[in-house]
């Protein structure tokens, strides 16, 4: 972390990282020794979840540098969730690595975050010293969501570009045709 980033702590409001298009990502950074541990959250998850904060406590106790962040449209980051794609979230992750953790890193990803961490590691192999993947969901747009897309959902995706997927955790959330098509690319 640079001296400027060392000033950011995990207490209080998150810091922000500007992204193209004027949106910002939200993050908390804990200064410490390297390699920096970087948390990659899951689909519709945010950096305030129990896994992200438990790893932060562990990092603090060890004096380990740590970054947790919210992707575009997640948590405290700007942007409309329905406009997010794997490509966009991968770009967010690479920006976090470039701007907030430019040295050696260990990526920790949960669910979709495991997929994004793998995609980031393929682009930055010299930087990534390790991967810890918790229930990674590579290709979840095809493997996990595909079987759930019934005739009514397909019709909604064809007609409006959006399917409101039921959720066990709250209100249904938008799955867009662009997310599914973009997921096929990776």
Name what the model sees in each region.
Residues 3-31:
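N-terminal cap/lid segment of alpha/beta-hydrolase-fold proteins
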Residues 83-100:
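Alpha/beta-hydrolase active-site loop
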Residues 22, 127-186:
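The alpha/beta-hydrolase serine catalytic core
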Residues 56-78:
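Conserved alpha/beta-hydrolase
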Residues 114-125, 131:
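Short glycine-enriched nucleophile-adjacent loop
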Residues 43-56:
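The serine-hydrolase catalytic nucleophile loop
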Residues 34-42:
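Short beta-strand element of the alpha/beta-hydrolase
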Residues 101-111:
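Alpha/beta-hydrolase fold nucleophile elbow
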């Amino acid at each position: 972390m640079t001296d400027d980033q060392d000033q950011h702590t995990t207490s209080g409001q998150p810091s922000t990282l500007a992204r193209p298009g004027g949106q910002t990502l939200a993050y908390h950074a804990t200064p410490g020794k390297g390699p920096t541990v970087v948390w990659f959250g899951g689909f519709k998850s945010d950096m305030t979840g129990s896994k992200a904060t438990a790893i932060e406590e562990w990092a603090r106790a060890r004096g380990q540098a740590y970054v947790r962040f919210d992707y575009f449209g997640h948590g405290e980051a700007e942007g409309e969730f329905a406009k997010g794609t794997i490509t966009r979230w991968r770009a967010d992750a690479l920006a976090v690595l470039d701007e907030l953790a430019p040295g050696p890193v260990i990526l920790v990803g949960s669910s979709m975050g495991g997929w994004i961490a793998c995609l980031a590691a393929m682009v930055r192999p010299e930087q990534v010293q390790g991967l810890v993947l918790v229930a990674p969901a590579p290709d979840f747009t095809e493997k996990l969501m595909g079987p759930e897309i019934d005739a009514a959902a397909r019709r909604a995706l064809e007609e409006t570009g959006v399917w409101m997927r039921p959720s066990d955790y709250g209100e249904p959330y938008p799955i867009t045709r662009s997310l599914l098509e973009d997921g096929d690319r990776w």
